[in-house]
Amino acid sequence: MPRRGYSKPGSWGSFWAMLTLVGLVTHAAQRADVGGEAAGTSINHSQAVLQRLQELLRQGNASDVVLRVQAAGTDEVRVFHAHRLLLGLHSELFLELLSNQSEAVLQEPQDCAAVFDKFIRYLYCGELTVLLTQAIPLHRLATKYGVSSLQRGVADYMRAHLAGGAGPAVGWYHYAVGTGDEALRESCLQFLAWNLSAVAASTEWGAVSPELLWQLLQRSDLVLQDELELFHALEAWLGRARPPPAVAERALRAIRYPMIPPAQLFQLQARSAALARHGPAVADLLLQAYQFHAASPLHYAKFFDVNGSAFLPRNYLAPAWGAPWVINNPARDDRSTSFQTQLGPSGHDAGRRVTWNVLFSPRWLPVSLRPVYADAAGTALPAARPEDGRPRLVVTPASSGGDAAGVSFQKTVLVGARQQGRLLVRHAYSFHQSSEEAGDFLAHADLQRRNSEYLVENALHLHLIVKPVYHTLIRTPK
């Protein structure tokens, strides 16, 4: 790296220059009393000091160590004239590495070597600009050299960009597993589950590992059009990955075949290459699905257990399971709508519907906070402010639901945005089965703010899902 000035490594002049500069950074923002009764005035020169630090790095003035960063597998070497004191303040590894030498050769993967200048810059001024492709190498460098603040910052960046739908979730998931970053791993897994349709249609789907695939197939909170879409996504993955038969058969057995209508099951058996190859491994599950669709749920429950995951719907976006609801200017006033869902996934109930009424209130107040204008003695009491309330969503059946014997309904509300014609889920709220609303629905949302993460062009995009959950009413006779 070119530089305009240079001091002898380890010189006392270099030491005192650096010590003075660090002192300036430490005391850049301070309070000063201007005398008399005047208020204290803030004197903040931190930006100027940061600029001087950047100049130190760029020009190499008063440097006392040299870092030679070689990209693995190449002859490319990048040279950085740096300052032992600043590197050691952030990294115990640098402190130990440079304690007895003024020059170090660092071997780094090519992607890490390419962003090493940004990494060093962060050690000097505490900021950097991150691109999606640079997140993993920067996080890897921060982890290797023990710069915990940068490690947390890059991980936060990755989680935030997952929520925005821009991040390569599959690659980041595998990276998180390899580094043991449980928080990032769980964030990636949640994003993939909530946006499986978009991921399965992208180039990332081919990079999914068998372990990640198995993690996804076990989840009931997958968001996708229907179970048939999941089967087709799995079949496409099998065609690309060509895993061992045991892996393929275990994955095929994770499909919830009772959630697929009989007509579509017949088509799968006739046309699916995966079933043609591994059909015997799932023959019992297909028979179970046909039996489930042929009998009434009450009759089926007399002989078979319906509490297994095979009979629990996932978060399906198909019209039979719910409806989208876009609320423009959601902070303005109360809104209501209604929609219908099928009574249950059984073919026996294919023509039976349940009507649901939905009420949205942007500023609902609990009874304890509702306005009271006077007490018994006529003394005026303060009214609660509208901003004291919170958004509320209530979903109730339009009738008593007498046809729903042996069934309870699990309600889920997805909050998200549409990008390129696909629903991108940012938040999901599940109702307790005995409740008509989600207690924490948009609890921290500011719907008054137009750039709120919950709004898209000042509209709240919801998708309401109702999942019937069967209960075993009569034990199977022995």
UniProtKB/Swiss-Prot annotation:
Residues carrying sugar: N61, N100, N195
Q: Which parts of the sequence belong to the BTB domain?
A: 63-132
Q: Please provide the record's keywords in A-Z order.
A: Glycoprotein, Secreted, Signal
Question: Which coarse location class describes where this protein primarily resides?
Answer: secreted
Q: Which GO terms describe its cellular component?
A: extracellular region; plasma membrane
Stored SMART domains: BACK, BTB
For the BACK domain, which residue ranges apply?
Answer: 169-269
Q: Name one Pfam family in it.
A: TRAF_BTBD17
Q: Where in the cell does this protein reside?
A: Secreted
Q: Which residues form the signal peptide?
A: 1-28
Q: Which Gene3D superfamilies match?
A: 1.25.40.420, Potassium Channel Kv1.1, Chain A
Q: Which SUPFAM superfamilies match?
A: POZ domain
Membrane spanning segments where? none
A Gene Ontology annotation in the biological process aspect, one of them, is: response to virus
Under which name does UniProt file this protein? BTB/POZ domain-containing protein 17
